[in-house]
Regions:
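Nudix hydrolase/Nudix homology domain
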Residues: 51-53, 122-166
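Active-site-adjacent beta-strand/loop module that shapes the phosphate/pyrophosphate-binding cleft
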Residues: 93-121
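Conserved Nudix-box catalytic region and its N-terminal flanking loop in Nudix hydrolases
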Residues: 37-77
């Protein structure tokens, strides 16, 4: 399944179990958080380059743990300070690749954590995220979202005591 969201002059393509997907040239470690708020709403961000909604997070940089990256990236991209409370899972499916706007083809390798908000108000950073919001589960269907992210949301909402692996 291919997900292409075009905004302005940039295009980002996400492929999820798509026979037309390009071959990845790099594995990109990333960390994201699933934060639930009153009424079961989820913290989501809207990416500037694709227009798609996803959990806040980003790349793990040299010298930091996945948990540190998740906390850092969530504060930057969503304006919310979080405390990691558990692991939803590791999402390492080699059939999930993204061709970024610069042409790099990345195999996704993502850690998704449960977290709770401990400060801040949702807002985009205007560089990577145009918006951040608490979104009701009932409103998720109408949002532009990559297929892999939809599966991550399903896992995050399942409250399975065993983390997803794969």
């Amino acid at each position: 399944m291919t997900s292409t969201v075009q905004r302005a002059a940039t295009t980002r393509h996400a492929y999820f179990h798509d026979s037309d997907a390009p071959v990845a040239t790099v594995v990109v470690p990333a960390a994201f958080v699933a934060v639930r708020w009153r009424g079961g709403r989820l913290l989501l961000v809207r990416r500037v380059e694709s227009g798609a909604w996803e959990f806040p997070g980003g790349r793990v940089v040299v010298g930091e743990s996945a948990e540190e990256a998740a906390v850092r990236c969530t504060a930057r991209a969503a304006g919310v300070k979080v405390l990691i409370t558990g692991l939803v899972g590791l999402f390492t499916d080699p059939a999930h690749v993204v061709r970024s706007e610069d042409g790099e083809v990345q195999q996704q390798f993502a850690a998704l954590f449960h977290a709770r908000a401990v400060g801040g108000e949702p807002h985009g950073d205007a560089r990577e995220t145009s918006e951040a919001a608490w979104v009701a589960v009932a409103d998720l269907r109408g949002l532009p979202m990559e297929p892999a992210v939809s599966s991550w949301i399903t896992e995050a909402l399942s409250f399975d005591p065993l983390p997803h692996l794969g």
